[in-house]
Swiss-Prot record:
<keyword id="KW-0699">rRNA-binding</keyword>
<dbReference type="InterPro" id="IPR023574">
    <property type="entry name" value="Ribosomal_uL4_dom_sf"/>
</dbReference>
<comment type="function">
    <text>One of the primary rRNA binding proteins, this protein initially binds near the 5'-end of the 23S rRNA. It is important during the early stages of 50S assembly. It makes multiple contacts with different domains of the 23S rRNA in the assembled 50S subunit and ribosome.</text>
</comment>
<comment type="function">
    <text>Forms part of the polypeptide exit tunnel.</text>
</comment>
<protein>
    <recommendedName>
        <fullName>Large ribosomal subunit protein uL4</fullName>
    </recommendedName>
</protein>
<dbReference type="GO" id="GO:1990904">
    <property type="term" value="C:ribonucleoprotein complex"/>
</dbReference>
<comment type="similarity">
    <text>Belongs to the universal ribosomal protein uL4 family.</text>
</comment>
<keyword id="KW-0689">Ribosomal protein</keyword>
<dbReference type="InterPro" id="IPR002136">
    <property type="entry name" value="Ribosomal_uL4"/>
</dbReference>
<dbReference type="GO" id="GO:0019843">
    <property type="term" value="F:rRNA binding"/>
</dbReference>
<keyword id="KW-0687">Ribonucleoprotein</keyword>
<dbReference type="GO" id="GO:0003735">
    <property type="term" value="F:structural constituent of ribosome"/>
</dbReference>
<dbReference type="Pfam" id="PF00573">
    <property type="entry name" value="Ribosomal_L4"/>
</dbReference>
<feature type="region of interest" description="Disordered">
    <location>
        <begin position="49"/>
        <end position="73"/>
    </location>
</feature>
<keyword id="KW-0694">RNA-binding</keyword>
<comment type="subunit">
    <text>Part of the 50S ribosomal subunit.</text>
</comment>
<dbReference type="GO" id="GO:0006412">
    <property type="term" value="P:translation"/>
</dbReference>
Length: 206
């Protein structure tokens, strides 16, 4: 499929051919769901922890005699039924990551790109660059394009001035091609690719 290439000043500067096998696949919500869950699970820190009975600070003395008191027998004041005691079956430090086949991850990225095309939310620009690292200047240019929630994906390296200028603009993210992922594509309303990004993504996903 063909689409227009524009500049950041909203001027049409040419056309580009988008590969149908990458930007025109059927949109499957189940694949996107699996990919987003995989990403979010993988980045969880998993450092939640409660103390077991062996880790609780306190006496190890038996609180009272086993027999003769008429009360239920107790062996430790660090047990879970006492104030300040341990937690039974509480969370432990662990990784939440789970496997997702490479083919599914690849299909999910194609699906996310195709979903943006299907929604009319994909824009191709000639370059994502800025003459100076001034946020005000870039914000004005994005305002002309009507971009309020946007992910920019550039080539192998992101323009330094553009990255600095966009850093303080809310809901504007910038990634190099190798950082392109399903979650970041879906969490922003509009996806903007540079021509270099299109070429790199097609090479990566073919």
């Amino acid at each position: 499929m063909k689409t227009n290439v524009i500049s950041l000043d909203n001027q049409t500067v040419g056309e580009i051919e988008l590969a149908d096998e990458i930007f025109g696949v059927p949109v499957r919500g189940d694949i996107l769901f699996r990919a987003v869950n995989w990403q979010l699970a993988k980045r969880q820190s998993g450092n939640h922890k409660t103390k077991t009975i062996s880790e609780i600070s306190g006496t190890t003395k038996k609180p009272f005699a086993q027999k003769g008191g008429g009360r239920a027998r107790q062996g430790s004041l660090r047990s879970a039924q006492f104030r300040g005691g341990s937690t039974i079956f509480g969370p432990v430090v662990r990784s939440h990551a789970h496997d997702l086949p490479k083919k599914v991850r690849k299909l999910a990225l194609k699906t996310a790109l195709s979903a943006k095309v299907a929604d009319g939310k994909l824009i191709v620009v000639d370059a994502a660059s800025a003459g100076s690292p001034k946020t005000k200047d870039l914000a004005a240019r994005l305002g002309k394009l009507g971009l309020s929630s946007v992910l920019f994906i550039d080539g192998a390296a992101v323009d330094g001035n553009f990255a600095l200028a966009s850093r303080n603009i809310p809901y504007v993210d910038v990634l190099p091609t190798q950082g392109a992922n399903v979650y970041d594509i879906l969490r922003r309303d509009t996806l903007v690719l540079t021509k270099d990004a299109v070429a790199a993504l097609e090479a990566r996903l073919k």
